[in-house]
Amino acid sequence: MDIVLYFVAVPILIVLIVSAVKVRGKTEEDNHEARQEVAAQVVGRLQAEEGSNRLRRRRNLNRMMANRMANSAYREAADNDSPVEVEEEYEEAEQQSQATGKRGAKKQKKLEEKQAKRAQREAELEEREERKRTQELREEERRKEDKKERILEQRQEEEELRAKEEQEKREEEEYLCLKQSFVVEEQGEADELTEQESQNLLQEFIQHIKDCKVVLLEDLASHFGLRTQDAISRLQDLLSDGSITGVIDDRGKFIFITPEEMNVVAQFIRQRGRVSITDLAQASNSLINLIPEIHNTA
C-alpha cells in the first residue's frame, strides 16, 4: 500500500515542480517586459524633454540672430541711406527684435527683400558707371583717331600744295626761258624782246605749227629767224609742257596731232591689237587730218 502511494505521489510531485518552474519563468518574463516598458517610457519622456529644450534653445538662438541682423541692418542703413530710410529701418529692426514665430519670419523676409533691392540698385549703379567709363574710353579713342586723320590730311594737303607750287614754279621758269629765247636779228645784233612781244611771238610760233599741221623744222626756224637746233629745242619744250601735241619724223618734219586725233589713233591700235608701222602709217591718212588749217579756211 505504501509503495503504491509512493509511485502515485512521485509523478504528482514532478508535475507540481515543473508547473512551479514554468509559473516562475513566466513571472520573471512578465517582470522583464514590464521593466523594459517602464524604461522605454522613461526614455521617451527624457527624449521629449530634450526635444522641448532643444526647440527652446533654437527659438532663443533665432531670436538672438534676428536681433543681431536688425542691429547690423540699422548700422548699414545709417551709413548708406537717407534719414527717412534710416528711421524706417530702425523701426523695422525694433519690430523684428520683438517679433516671434511667424510674424518675426515675415518681418525678416521683408528686411531681406529690402536688402536685396538695395544690392540690386547698387549693382545697377555700378553697371551704369561701367558703361559710362567704357563710352568715355571709346570717345577718347575716336578723338585720337580723328586727330591723327586730321594731321595726316593736313600733311597731305601741305605736300600737294608744295608739289603744286614747285610745278608752277618750274613751268614758269621754263616758260620764261622759252620766251626769252625768241630774239630777232637786226643788223647782225640780237636785241632782246619785251615780255609782251616774247609772249606774242610764242603764241604765234604755236599757232603757226597748228595751222600748218605738217611743217619742216628748217622752214619753221627760218620763219621765226631761229637756228634749226633752237627751233627743235623750243618745239621739244612745248611738247614737254603739253602746249602742243605731235611727232617729229625722221625726215625733219613735225606733224601736229590734236588730242582728239591721238585718242582716235589709240582706239585704232586697241581694236587691231598688234599694228605694224606700215599699217599705222597707211591708217594715219584717214585717222589724222594733215590738211593745213590755212587751206581749210580758204
From Swiss-Prot:
Residues 22-298 are cytoplasmic. One of its GO terms (biological process) is reticulophagy. A motif (UFM1-interacting motif (UFIM)) lies at residues 181-195. Gene3D superfamilies: Winged helix-like DNA-binding domain superfamily/Winged helix DNA-binding domain (1.10.10.10). Its main location: endoplasmic reticulum. Coiled coil: none annotated. Residues 71-149 are annotated as: Disordered. It is found in: Endoplasmic reticulum membrane. Residues 82-94 have a biased composition (Acidic residues). Keywords: Endoplasmic reticulum, Membrane, Transmembrane, Transmembrane helix, Ubl conjugation pathway. It is a single-pass membrane protein. Component of the UFM1 ribosome E3 ligase (UREL) complex, composed of ufl1, ddrgk1 and cdk5rap3. The UFM1-interacting motif (UFIM) specifically recognizes and binds ufmylated RPL26/uL24, resulting in stable association between the 60S ribosome and the UREL complex. Belongs to the DDRGK1 family. This is DDRGK domain-containing protein 1. It comes from Osmerus mordax (Rainbow smelt).
